[in-house]
Amino acid sequence: MAQTSTYSYTERKRIRKSFGSRDSVLKVPYLLQMQRDAYTAFLQADTAPQKRSIEGLQAAFNSAFPIVSHNGFVEMKFVEYNLAKPAFDVRECQTRGLTFASAVRAKVQLIIYDRESSTSQSKVVKEVKEQEVYMGEVPLMTDKGSFIINGTERVIVSQLHRSPGVFFEHDKGKTHSSGKLLFSARIIPYRGSWLDFEFDPKDILYFRVDRRRKMPVTILLKAIGLNPESILANFFVNDNFRLMDSGAQLEFVPERLRGEVARFDITDKAGKVIVAKDKRVTARHTRELEQSGTTHISVPEDFLIGRVVARNIVDGDTGEILAKANEELTEALLKKLRAAGVQDLQVIYTNELDQGAYISQTLRIDETVDEFAARVAIYRMMRPGEPPTEDAVQALFQRLFYNPDTYDLSRVGRMKFNAKIGRDEATGPMVLSNDDILAVVKILVDLRNGKGEVDDIDHLGNRRVRCVGELAENQYRTGLARIEKAVKERLGQAEQEPLMPHDLINSKPISAALKEFFGASQLSQFMDQTNPLAEITHKRRVSALGPGGLTRERAGFEVRDVHVTHYGRVCPIETPEGPNIGLINSLALYARLNEYGFIETPYRRVVDGKVTMEIDYLSAIEEGKYIIAQANATLDAEGRLTGDLVSAREKGESTLVSADRVQYMDVSPAQIVSVAASLVPFLEHDDANRALMGANMSRQAVPVLRPEKPMVGTGIERVAAVDSGTVVTANRGGVVDYVDATRIVVRVNDDEAVAGEVGVDIYNLIKYQRSNQNTNIHQRPIVKKGDKLAKGDVIADGASTDLGEIAIGQNMLIAFMPWNGYNFEDSILISERVVAEDRYTSIHIEELVVMARDTKLGAEEITRDIPNLSEQQLNRLDESGIIYVGAEVQPGDTLVGKVTPKGETTLTPEEKLLRAIFGEKASDVKDTSLRVDQGSQGTVIDVQVFTREGIQRDKRAQQIIDDELKRFRLDLNDQLRIVEADAFDRIEKLLTGRVANGGPQKLAKGTKIDKAYLASVEKFHWFDIRPAEEEVATQLESIKNALEQTRHSFDLAFEEKRKKLTQGDELPAGVLKMVKVYLAVKRRLQPGDKMAGRHGNKGVVSKIVPVEDMPYMADGTPADIVLNPLGVPSRMNIGQVLEVHLGWAGKGMGQRIGDMLQREAKTAELRKFLEEIYNSRGRKEELSQLSDDEILAMARELTSGVPFASPVFDGASEEEIKDMLKLAYPDDLAQAKGLTETRTQAYLYDGRTGERFERPTTVGYMHYLKLHHLVDDKMHARSTGPYSLVTQQPLGGKAQFGGQRFGEMEVWALEAYGAAYVLQEMLTVKSDDVQGRTKVYENIVKGEHAIEAGMPESFNVLVKEIRSLGLDIELERS
């Protein structure tokens, strides 16, 4: 068992000294959790069918089934589904260009009911047919959270969309010129019709369905069963009047009078005037009226006029309706009412301030009379031009909001809806109810009346994340819905014909829907694989674009902006520059999704000012209820918040609060940023714009030949490397049994081995694999034979990782000084030594493909027999016509020989005879071989040959298969070797000292077995020993059986592999054979390459200077890179300067350790110095855990520099950096290097003259990256090449081998110079004058250098365009 220690295998080799002021409370969660969890929940592959929860595939099937035939006598029920084992593993899919997927098989029952004996209440089953039906293939997620689609690795990006529910907003006064706020509400379901309510400038309330024509809202209220009386009763309170002979008595309600201007004298019971006419009624007046016991107030007649009747007034004698609800009172109407003897009158109470008559006014313009008429009106709006029959009208209205098949609010929508309208329960039906609609209209009217607040749509409580699982489920549902339609139509036939479920179900729609989504959806993206950081960021990306999301053009400023709720959920720094800024975001480091898809972030609970270790995840909505302190708040020894006031956040605002009011505290200062931003040291000293560039450019760093750990990191490097899946980690603890460049074999610890399984883990390393960006993925072992490992230890480094830490660049000695103008405007000056040492050399792998197709004239052939090629040009091709692995090729070299049949030419009899005799075949085929492109060269590192089923394999293909089988057999042999060794060890322990009944080499009965005897017998003959004890004999037998079983299973595995390799390959239609050749290209650093630091300090290499000309230090050390100091102050990314200082300290310490090792200092002295480095400041490390050997091994690793971690927002202070510099450079050393007092600057000498520069220069080490914008990929020149078909102008761009555009402004420049002939040449023969350019060619051949410019083709295009408009235009030559 590996020793229990806080340090892993790689950490023991190199501990990163951290300056973090507080220990981590919560480990950084697994960074691909969101993707992995979402897809696991979608598939539920490892859950027993009976125990599956209703989500993902299960929910999709449940929504589509049961399917019932039109007559109701046949039904198809879904029982369960299961997923088959994928036919090919991930690596095989990548090589063969297949999709890594699993077949879905659903068990369905076809139930046929007996027509005769069935009644409408109970149906009698006639027969049931059960069958498993193939339901398409579902792509599987790899361990790294990506998908392999058609052989390429893709990522499904999560989408941030508006949560279902109800939203209230106003137009911010933009619609109407007066600036009046128009309020609106919108009910957004997960699936189904949107329902909008909106006020117009006249305060009439309208509704619209799916953004169609708007209609008065009372039509909808009538359609849901309300009549005008109940509508008014729902929205208004009533004023009660008692009609007198003249005037009336108003029932007195104090709060309704307050603030009104009295239109008449208001008196109390005694007739005393309390409020005079035209005075405003105040709270004092209403109090006097109450105290005087006033219950009614006399009001004059004109006070009643214009008031609105609240309910129908019916004549008690005749039953005639005298006044309808919502009718206005007029003098005539009052007269009529008095005449009919009506005494009590109820009118609605409205006022200008907070009780508007909006619904009443809307009801007035609504012409529908009853519920049916209202539904007809809605039908006409939804289906204009169709005759509204009663059935159709009712069916449509039901289908709009009340039918679960067509309308689904979803759990999230219902939860948000209920929360918004003030219900306590979070669950409920997934369709709307009448109460729901009424509640929304009530809230909207209240808003217009000035009560309540509108919603903020950019609040993360109103936006939720749709993950891979949910997106895939929606696609699967679409496919199933199409199947459902088809099955429903055919179910009727199942009664007459003996059909089985698979005859009815065609899985094509599902496959098509999934294929379309995974292959072509906007959210299914080609994985960014430049380096591990790019991969991990891509999988954690959250996009607001995509189907059902925003579009770039429509997204305004608010959506893109940083919102307070982004804190700890979405990174405020990492987002692309350009049109997508703010629409594509990255998940913050600790963020996760809750069950509803809202982003949550963790906080530590604070109780009475004491910070506990309890951690709660809060969503944006919950967070608003609490006061949350920052992670760097100072705590005393007991963990209490110190100081009177603590900096905290309340409802998104930063405030200072007393310690006892704080309820939560951040878990880490890095909580607010994403992975990429958290890898930038001293981020807190950089301007946000530059930090954004720094985080984005880290993702473009190319993996170099020998990755080097950053001297100054942040402590996240290890987590990011391990979670990205680039490094290889041990699945189980154990001892390394065998290591070479391609595989690591680990013998698993006994306590971790599962009974009945092989106790061996074999890790096959990836060698020179091409990434999506053509960079090189390559793994190197970092363990030795005999090393003890624990589970999770890093055992092999991948691209851009060094000892299990992300290492995207190299540590370079940087000097900040101008150098002869070569670092003007962000240019970078580099020493030749950097290039000579291959520090920035990267390997790029290109894939070249050739296909032999079946053409009309016959099959193409891959062959060495190519017409018109000399033997010299063919000498690197093998007999199959395919290049050897290891060949170095130049532009134009043949990689794969291929000939295509030409059209048959008619032959004379003589030619036919000659051809029959000599077999001359060359003339009827043309050479279409695969050649190396212009401008690329390299070494062939791999060749793959794919052959269609039924076509003879060539020798090369056979050899590739044999090699692959040999490799596979090696793995199996290793496993077998360890299993056998293990078994024989157990047998030895079992038999030693036991009594035998006999055995090989004439073992006498009753003899004790000893080790010497066992050693003399062949191990496989040990099984022939017959132990006397029954129990021992059975154990021996069981070991023998287990061994045989293992051998048998290995043979089966080998056979399966052989079958897989020898079966024909799936190739595109018409392709008989396909050859892929992989070229490795070495790219050295050269002028024109883009480089950058991690702080947004980017530049282009301007010159590579001989090392002897570079500025050097007093001890002769030359600088590696010279940067312009003017690039720092205006850009405000000071983090780079601090990084340089701290890197300088790390290097100095490394050199001191190196000196100690060189003079073979005692381990105690080393320990003392390491203690001083690690434990004098910042976080303490437990070096006592390491043995002397481990200390020595670590010291050797540290000679290149001591790595530091300066966590984001909790980094090293200026004091700490100064202390480290003092420790690294004692006075004597500082003097020898010519350092200043602070050790941050040095006096440099000019490499060319040897003179000392007069001022000291800032020098130190910075982690500098080479980016994926390489000059080799961009540089391009053309003499003649392809032309566009219509305009006859040269194409553009390197890919098309295009020309340089001579644009409008360039034409002006030539005009300004008066260079008429140059201009004519540019606009004619060098562009689109077809005759002219052939003429020029002829003239050059003749040796005349004359130009005859003709008519540019673009003029002819213009003439044709004008003619197409029906205008005849002719060119007359004068």
From Swiss-Prot:
Alphabetical list of InterPro entries matching this protein: DNA-dir_RNA_pol_bsu_ext_1_sf, DNA-dir_RNA_pol_bsu_external_1, DNA-dir_RNA_pol_su2, DNA-dir_RNAP_su2_dom, DNA-dir_RNAP_su2_hyb_sf, RNA_pol_bsu_bac, RNA_pol_bsu_CS, RNA_pol_bsu_protrusion
GO biological process, one term: DNA-templated transcription
Reaction(s) this enzyme catalyzes, per UniProt: RNA(n) + a ribonucleoside 5'-triphosphate = RNA(n+1) + diphosphate
CDD domains: RNA_pol_B_RPB2
PROSITE patterns xref list: RNA_POL_BETA
Top-rank taxon: Bacteria
Pfam families: RNA_pol_Rpb2_1 (PF04563), RNA_pol_Rpb2_2 (PF04561), RNA_pol_Rpb2_3 (PF04565), RNA_pol_Rpb2_45 (PF10385), RNA_pol_Rpb2_6 (PF00562), RNA_pol_Rpb2_7 (PF04560)
EC number: 2.7.7.6
GO MF terms held by the record: DNA binding; DNA-directed RNA polymerase activity; ribonucleoside binding
SUPFAM superfamilies: beta and beta-prime subunits of DNA dependent RNA-polymerase
Any one Gene Ontology cellular component term annotated for this protein: DNA-directed RNA polymerase complex
Keyword Transcription: yes
Alphabetic keyword roster: DNA-directed RNA polymerase, Nucleotidyltransferase, Transcription, Transferase
Subunit and partners: The RNAP catalytic core consists of 2 alpha, 1 beta, 1 beta' and 1 omega subunit. When a sigma factor is associated with the core the holoenzyme is formed, which can initiate transcription.
Function: DNA-dependent RNA polymerase catalyzes the transcription of DNA into RNA using the four ribonucleoside triphosphates as substrates.
HAMAP family named in the record: RNApol_bact_RpoB (MF_01321)
Homology family: Belongs to the RNA polymerase beta chain family.
PANTHER family: DNA-DIRECTED RNA POLYMERASE I SUBUNIT 2
Record-given protein name: DNA-directed RNA polymerase subunit beta
Species for this entry: Acidovorax ebreus (strain TPSY) (Diaphorobacter sp. (strain TPSY))
